[in-house]
Amino acid sequence: METKYLRINPADNVAVAIVNLPAGEHLSVDGIEITLNEDIPAGHKFALKNFAEGENVIKYGYPIGHARMAKKQGDWMNETNIKTNLAGLLDYTYNPIQVSLDIPHKDLTFKGYRRKNGDVGVRNEIWIIPTVGCVNGIIGQLAEGLRRETEGKGVDAIVAFPHNYGCSQLGDDHENTKKILRDMVLHPNAGAVLVVGLGCENNQPDVFREFLGEFDEDRVKFMVTQKVGDEYEEGMEILRDLYAKASKDERTDVPLSELRVGLKCGGSDGFSGITANPLLGMFSDFLIAQGGTSVLTEVPEMFGAETILMNRCKNEELFEQTVHLINDFKEYFLSHGEPVGENPSPGNKAGGISTLEEKALGCTQKCGKSYVSGVMPYGERLQKKGLNLLSAPGNHLVAATTLAASGCHMVLFTTGRGTPFGTFVPTMKISTNSTLAKNKPGWIDFNAGVIVENEPMEKTCERFIDYIIKVASGEFVNNEKKGYREIAIFKTGVTL
């Protein structure tokens, strides 16, 4: 029997249409008899009761806003008649909850690359990273030259990562650029790195070299283009040497406890919080139970669900760090005169998401139910296993880059609308609905839409775990197959 609707939580006073529902259709929702007053698109909400103006709309068991006007049972509930409850900064109280997850330990492994410092990568690639955007053209030619000479064999990829920064920046922007580039140079998915500088930039190559801290000097080389004659020939000579070393690396068995994944959503729809995001949450809990690590970011998309995360913090110090994480981003919004609740995009709204609270309550399901073990500033590298919260905006390119820079081996990216984007680590797209998976097979790597088509979540998660292990062991995802590899760095200040 086809599932036509879903009431996610018994406390909800709206339900979600799983398929397009016509006006006049009669439904029985948990004993509530309803006749729809309007057509309800799939992924959208309809009222289970009459609403008075100002009355809270409940989904996932929490308020997602309030009714802008009186609405009748069976009405379509969307952004035109639901308004956010979010305001400015809030005071929070630590009300810790007990987390008890009965997840068995399994001796699972993947095939990864063990690096000289003991870290593990899931790819063995050669990266060309510029200290400044002025040399973007050069690094592109160098990457193409080495790919042509090697015919793309011997390593997983040879990639140049252009960006616009490294000069004309001050303060936090300059530091953020240095941090993200440092994190890339030190990332274990790179078997070798050539750092290319100009020579006169703010991000001075010699200073940046010191900023890296300890690194493998056999696998990380520098070239300052103002100090060499023919930068192409010089760069190719260095790259040939790096390739000779990296191409000898081999995969070996690595316990799943060493896997680190970033949790991301984008182009969300009304199914995100029902299918793909809960799937990631179940996987995240499983990975953490095996001793692994997951990272949640997109701080503005936590607004409205932040107390759920705060109360899962292992201790009060982490709680205070999470409060700072949330309020720091709210202050960023307010300092620019922007309301903190102005988030859902046109695509979100078309897909059935009406307010930021609704988006947040779906978004935060990606991190499951585990304790919060760490809270990280922007650009910092992972120090703690388990579930970590990371400071970054919701922007796809910036957030995914930040997750990868923290040390995540791959980014798990749920989407209801679809996106081809990939960052500098494998960026796996998980569709929230089967229509998207069918229409965009060149973008979507895994379809979570089957969860509302009567495949149990547990079975879907078992398949998902198997697929994650295959990807960690070398199977390419679509963004890698197509060469969609980009980085974006968070900018908040002036440009000189």
Q: Positions of the model-derived regions?
A:
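Metallocofactor- and cofactor-centric catalytic cores in central/energy metabolism, strongly enriched
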Residues: M1-M410, R417-L496
